[in-house]
A protein has these predicted regions:
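Flexible glycine/proline-rich, aromatic-decorated loop/lid segments
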Residues: 259, 445-480
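N-terminal export/assembly segments and adjacent metallocofactor-ligating motifs
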Residues: 1-289, 299, 310, 319-323, ...
Length: 764
């Protein structure tokens, strides 16, 4: 055994521990270099030992665009909170946003440029210099551009907005390529299409939950994962508790109880894919009851003739009395609001469903008034780029082009379709046919592992950028993100990488900026110049400093709001196609309901240990994937909690343990999205299963979006058990009569005892 003398032992103890913390044991010889704690030779400008400094920036953990404020000490980020001045989140921040520090300090970050040395996908890489990596990419792109083959270059990015999106567009325009795609599994393309069809507007509306008195949600988990949950949570709370008049009433319609369903006054389970029929049945009743008397009333009556309450009740499984009661309450409460999304929008008739929800708002008079649906004005900065959001059809077409040799270079910016796109799109096979794949990701995700070159980007806490939230908050808003710490590793900002490539390709005139910060300043100078003389700052420098310091800016001289004009042909086109499912009901008796969680999102949170340890708010499960089954269904199949089942669709199969969950329809099973990574670091790899991988390529014909709620599955009991890690115990009484019952299920003595408790009920 190697010996160590007293003096060396004391040195090790002074370094932090008796050797163990340094990565080796005392029983072994010391082979690793000694690491010293070196103070700043040139400390940051605002460095003050022991004094915290706060920087305002923008959260990019999802697409909501919340403002954040980051506490730093001694040049290190310590805590992230919401920016109180930002109108989207107003000082609040979700758990995923709080975990942004673990993106910055994640031990699995890519720390330097790398080039592939082994077979593609083998994980064999070597470090290279930035000059070498950028030159390899620039030389290939320059050659393609000179030969007029620019359209063989594809830039595939996560969803980005603002001047970075504009920079991508300018770069690809110079390449002569129209293949700039933004792909995210969560992009609400169906909602955009429905609003474009019904209103002729391309922007998402503002849903005024704060001022509504009656909310009908058709599948939209507005408190959990839908569009901007922090902002919607604020509106929900104020409608419920901060009103001087009657508190808002909330009704949630969905096949599986979400966070929003648990917080609602009433949860209603409609047959999957029939939510739009329910909306039209309510609209039919409003017309029949005289709740709408507009000049186009007769046209609406004719259009909705087939959606009587009786026929809708038969289709949806919801009693006619319930439909009439909801319709009356919705029409008679002012203001009221109907929203749609989530699984209701994830069916083959998703666009029809959301158009029906818009029609319900129109007939109830909820358009353009506080507490209803308000369309946002145009963003303060609109990108004039070639970019477009890619859906399943677009990605399948890209894969087909790659297999046919029409894609020579693929550049990836934090997009991970290997995890978030069903295999039926053919994307994995397509990668084998692309000569050069370049990734700008900060992590080794599934798609980055297939790259030839990796040019790793800074995290959002190390970068300059900006954002213009979509949907807005009723007036134009812009946010600026700034570096809150110096870069930890040999990485570069995404915008700076693109600008350096442009310089090496001789595109200085088209993209003349030295770095992303300079591009931002020039872009925000245009915004400053548009402001009225009465509201603008004394100089641009004063304006820029104030925006960076505050982290947010709102346009004081708002533009005229878009008018609510319904296309004349829309009323005649109102119809609900029956939902189509992949797999016949005999062989595949259950409808798979994949859902987003507020921790994992589309899987991007899986490499953050805080998110892995955060209990699911509805089931209290952590760390894995599970299959939620109704108790009646579980009993009929002989299943209990922890039974390992095989979930099989027409596209594949996966295994997960059973979790008996009473808040789900008997013919529906639910699985959370986010786990099942084969790469993406130590915290995410080989944990749980990914239900996206067994989704069938069932599309919404109107848009090409994936109908991700339209896959049928069957369950096969493997006879094995798996331990579910839960923090919430069980939801069953085990015969102990813990939960007292009232109504027909209660005994007369128990009923009398419950009714003896003095309860005051607020008037409706």
């Amino acid at each position: 055994m190697a010996k160590i003398d007293r003096r060396d032992f004391i040195k090790l103890v002074g370094a932090g521990s008796a050797g163990a913390g340094a990565g080796f044991m005392l029983a072994q010889s010391i082979k690793h270099p000694i690491e010293y704690l070196i103070p700043y030779p040139v400390p940051p400008e605002d460095f003050s030992p022991g004094i915290a400094t706060w920087y305002n920036s923008v959260c990019t953990m999802c697409s909501a665009g919340c403002g954040i404020t980051v506490r730093t000490r001694e040049g290190r980020a310590k805590k992230i909170e919401g920016n109180p001045s930002h109108p989207v989140n107003q000082g609040r921040l979700c758990a995923l946003g709080q975990a942004g520090l673990q993106v910055l300090y994640n031990p699995d970050r890519l720390t330097a440029p790398m080039a592939r040395t082994g077979e593609r996908g083998s994980g064999s890489f070597e470090q290279i210099t930035w000059g070498d990596g950028l030159s390899r990419v620039a030389d290939r792109l320059g050659s393609i551009r000179e030969d007029g083959r620019g359209d063989s270059v594809c830039f595939l990015s996560e969803g980005v907005r603002g001047h970075l999106a504009d920079l991508f567009g300018r770069f690809m325009e110079q390449m002569g390529s129209g293949r700039l795609l933004h792909y995210e599994f969560t992009h609400p393309g169906t909602l955009y299409a429905a609003n474009q069809h019904f209103f002729g507007e391309q922007y998402l509306p503002y849903y005024d939950l704060q001022n509504t008195r009656f909310l009908l949600s058709f599948g939209a988990d507005y408190l959990g994962s839908w569009i901007s949950p922090v902002h919607h949570g604020l509106g929900y709370g104020r409608s419920r508790a901060a009103r001087h008049d009657t508190r808002g009433r909330f009704v949630q319609i969905e096949p599986r109880m979400s966070i929003s369903g648990a917080a609602a006054d009433e949860w209603i389970a409609a047959r999957p894919g029939t939510e739009g029929m329910l909306a039209l049945g309510m609209a039919h009743h409003i017309l029949a009851a005289g709740g709408y008397n507009g000049s186009d009333r007769e046209q609406w009556v004719a259009a909705l003739d087939a959606y009587s309450v009786g026929s809708v009740a038969a289709s949806t499984g919801i009693p006619g009395d319930t439909i009439r009661r909801l319709a009356d309450r919705f029409a008679q409460t002012n203001p009221s609001l109907a929203i749609g999304g989530g699984a209701a929008a994830g069916h083959s008739n998703g666009v029809d469903t959301l158009v029906a929800v818009n029609a319900l708002n129109y007939l109830a008079g909820n358009l353009g008034q506080a507490g209803g649906l308000l369309f946002n004005t145009a963003p303060a900065f609109e990108t004039t780029t070639l970019s477009r959001h890619a859906n399943f059809r677009t990605m399948a077409e890209l894969a087909a082009d790659a297999r046919n040799g029409r894609i020579e270079v693929l550049i990836l910016n934090h997009a991970n379709p290997m995890h978030t796109l069903p295999p039926s799109a053919g994307f994995r096979e397509a990668l084998d046919h692309i000569p050069m794949i370049v990734s700008l990701s900060s992590f080794m995700d599934e798609t980055t592992a297939m790259a030839d070159l990796i040019l790793p980007s800074h995290t959002y806490l190390e970068s300059w950028g900006d954002d213009f939230p979509e949907p807005g908050v009723g007036f134009p808003v812009g946010s600026v993100s700034q570096p809150v710490v110096s870069p930890l590793y040999n990485t570069r900002a995404t915008g700076d990488i693109i600008l350096e490539l442009a310089r090496k390709m001789g595109l200085d005139e088209a993209l003349p900026w030295a770095d992303m910060k300079q591009r931002l300043r020039e872009g925000w100078k245009d915004i400053y110049d548009r402001e009225s003389a009465a509201s603008k700052a004394s100089s641009f420098e004063a304006f820029w400093s104030s925006v960076v310091e505050a982290g947010v800016w709102g346009e004081k001289t708002g533009r005229a709001a878009a008018a609510f004009t319904v296309k004349p042909e829309v009323i005649d086109s109102i119809a609900m196609a029956a939902p189509e499912f992949a797999g016949d009901s005999d062989s595949y008796p259950f409808i798979l309901h994949p859902y987003l969680t507020n921790a994992m999102h589309d899987g991007r949170g899986a490499n953050l240990p805080w998110m892995q340890e955060l209990p699911d708010p509805m089931t209290s499960v952590v760390y894995g994937t599970w299959v939620e089954i109704n108790p009646v269904t579980a009993q009929s199949l002989g299943l209990s909690d922890g039974d390992l089942v095989q979930v099989e669709s027409t596209e594949g199969q996966l295994s997960a343990p059973v979790l008996i969950f009473p808040g789900i329809m008997p013919d529906v099973i639910a699985m959370p999205i986010g786990q099942g990574h084969s790469e993406y670091g130590r915290y995410a790899k080989n944990r749980g299963a990914n239900p996206i991988q067994i989704l069938a390529p069932q599309l919404q014909s109107a848009t090409g979006d994936l109908a991700w709620s339209a896959t049928r599955v069957r369950l096969v009991n493997t006879g094995l058990k798996a331990n579910l890690v839960k923090t919430g115990g069980v939801s069953r009484e085990l015969g102990r009569d813990i939960i007292q019952k009232t109504g027909t299920a209660a005994s007369s003595s128990q009923h009398a005892a419950l009714n003896s408790i003095p309860i005051k009920v607020a008037p409706s």
